Amino acid sequence: MEQSMSSEQAERVAGRVEQLGGFQNNESINQRALLLLQRNRQRRQLLQRQEDRTRYIPDDAKRRVVERVAEPAAAESRADGAREEERAARPARPRETRRIAKKPQRYRPSDVALQEIRRYQRSTELLISRMPFARLVKEVTDQFTTVDQQMRWQSMAILALQEASEAYIVGLLEHTNLLALHAKRVTVMRKDMQLARRIRGQFI
């Protein structure tokens, strides 16, 4: 009997010890549960406040808020659509294209001279500016007239003189260039112009 009583007491003590340990674990679990409950209550309170605000806000204000929220989203969607269209419109570049630095195109001096000759042969415009030519004509005529007898020029008369003088100069330079080429030279020299004037019958 004594042995059975001692074994029962030992079992009871062990059970109490286990219960105490379980109580301690349960206390930590209970603390966590309380924290979670408090957080949930706070969230519910916040949600209720937001719902109360939306209830008491008039419909016009709600629409304004919705429009303010919707406008940036619509603008972003439009911008995205425009970017996609631009990308689709661009021609697709090959992936393995290497950018090669282009060298500036350089012409020889002879090519540039030939281009200028062709351009001036096609054009019919006057090469000498009008005002300096008119001043030169007036200076020359003033040398042969007195102060009382100054000559006056019409604009068409000065223009006719300019046309004639430019035609003469162009013809003389053309013959001078031909004589330089005949002498197996490219550079025009003074003696070429003298010979051209002598052949024409115009002595220096």
From Swiss-Prot:
Region (H3-like): 89-202
Keyword Ubl conjugation appears in the UniProt entry: yes
Feature: compositional bias, Basic and acidic residues: 77-99
Domain of life per record: Eukaryota
Intracellular or extracellular location(s): Nucleus; Chromosome, Centromere
UniProt cross-references to CDD domains, sorted A to Z: HFD_H3
Region (Disordered): 68-107
Summary of the function given for this chain in its UniProt record: Histone H3-like nucleosomal protein that is specifically found in centromeric nucleosomes. Replaces conventional H3 in the nucleosome core of centromeric chromatin that serves as an assembly site for the inner kinetochore. Required for recruitment and assembly of kinetochore proteins, mitotic progression and chromosome segregation. May serve as an epigenetic mark that propagates centromere identity through replication and cell division.
Family named by the database record: Belongs to the histone H3 family.
Protein name as it appears in the record: Histone H3-like centromeric protein CSE4
Lineage of origin: Eukaryota, Fungi, Dikarya, Ascomycota, Saccharomycotina
Gene assigned in the entry: CSE4
